[in-house]
Amino acid sequence: MQYLITTAVCLLAGLGAGLGTGFAGMSAAAVITPMLVTFLGIEPYTAVGIALASDVLASAVSAYTYGKNKNLDIKNGLVMMITVLIFTVVGSFVSSLVPSVTMGNFSVFMTLLLGIKFIVRPVMTTKADMSARTAKSVLIKSIICGIMVGFICGFIGAGGGMMMLLLLTSVMGYELKTAVGTSVFIMTFTALTGSVSHFAIGGLPDMLPFILCIIFTLIFARIAAKIANKASPKTLNRVTGIILVILGIVVLGFSLLSNITA
């Protein structure tokens, strides 16, 4: 019976996380962590490690799919990724020096707000609009956005995927598919770094939820990325917005449930 419950929870967690990653470049940690903590009683630190490990392959397969469809900016993505990684460490260090800030639901609110934004004000930037930007301005914006995302992620420990998507579409002027493709490309490496450090510090988790979450998230991320790359910009904005709003509400519900039962 316990195996059945674990499989069902991991399937639902992988479904939500995979769709969020493939459609919107959302971090799997936002969905998987609260579900594992609430329904399987897994320690939050271990649950985050499992979620980050699930993120690695799901983000990698999504990035490959977006890249194959020419919806990935590797050059500027690498610049942003390096700055994100450096300033995540800086943010973590600064966070350790100041009184603890509890912003556990930050990424959930980011998810909800972004979802509403995509429905109400879709990102209709085109590839032609993107090519009008100068290489220098894109490079400078990549560094600035990387610093912001990295520092905030390190400081409060959440919100990377959604913040990246917001900055890539609103500040850097990417069209939605390229923004998601670049976001999942960066997340592949940030999630890998995060999961390795988690398990190096806290030890390996229970193998069943670990393997199931990775497999289910990977499958649904692959499906979502394939659909997203074939969809029209208007449809993709709407679908992405609806998925983010639903996931935001569901995760917020799990968070409230775990607080009530705690």
Residue ranges and their predicted role:
Residues 53-61, 86-90, 94, 185-193:
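Membrane-embedded alpha-helical segments of transport systems
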Residues 19-28, 68-72, 171-181, 234:
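Membrane-helix interface "capping/anchor" motifs
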Residues 18, 48-56, 180-191, 244:
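Transmembrane helix-bundle signature of multi-pass membrane transporters/permeases
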Residues 54, 182-198, 208-221:
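A small-residue-rich subset of transmembrane alpha-helices
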Residues 1-17, 33, 37-39, 44, ...:
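Juxtamembrane transmembrane-helix boundary motif
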Residues 1-6, 10, 53-64, 159-168, ...:
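Hydrophobic, membrane-facing alpha-helical anchors
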Residues 42-50, 75-76, 173-184:
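Membrane-interface alpha-helices at helix entry/exit sites of multi-pass transporters
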Residues 23-32, 157-167:
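Transmembrane helix boundary and interhelical junction motifs in multipass membrane proteins
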